[in-house]
Amino acid sequence: MKKFLFTALLAVAGFAAQSQSNSVLVYGSLGINSAKTAADVKTNSFSFTPGAGYQFNDHWTGGVNLKTESWKSGSPQIKSSAFSAGPFVRYAYPLSNIFAVFGQLNTNWATGKVAGVKSSGFEGVLFPAIGVNMKNGFALNFNFGSLGITTSKVKGQSGSSTQFGLNFGSGAGFGISKNFGL
């Protein structure tokens, strides 16, 4: 598993947010949240989502993405975690030297644990985004919404669950990327 993750991380390191043929792009986002309700219930969460890929031509990029998340909530404390990894494909359309729009499809194998109960499954997510090219191959990426499906099965139980989601205007994300020319 460690070899797979290392190989995937290296592969993702080759993709760029901007449209630049024969280049490698490395991107990611980080999330840290903490909340406390009036009933003194505390929730803490952490997420890290890196990816890397190769820019085949001025529009198409393919690579590998990873996602790790963890949560702690309540009293007594309930711990949850999730991990997913898989390939992605991105189609980018430059609007100018500064702005580009792109759509990205992530297809991941996923595993998780909530209060000691393990599950595994598959997730597919398609999302639109805007890239703002900065200097030296860096870009700020803003995604806004998603279309996704997730299937999961709890270990030791028969049957599985499926979730479908369409979110536009109700969710947004921010990330950074670096493009390395080859």
List where the protein language model places each region.
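Transmembrane beta-strands of outer-membrane beta-barrel proteins
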Residues: 24-28, 62-64, 85, 101-105, ...
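Predominantly the C-terminal beta-signal and adjacent terminal strand-loop region
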Residues: 70-76, 126-182
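Short glycine/proline- and aromatic-enriched beta-strand/turn motifs that initiate or cap beta-hairpins
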Residues: 18-65, 69-71, 113, 167-182
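Repeated loop/turn-to-beta-strand initiation elements of outer-membrane beta-barrel proteins
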Residues: 24, 59-62, 97-99, 132, ...
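Cleavable N-terminal export/targeting peptides
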Residues: 1-23, 181-182
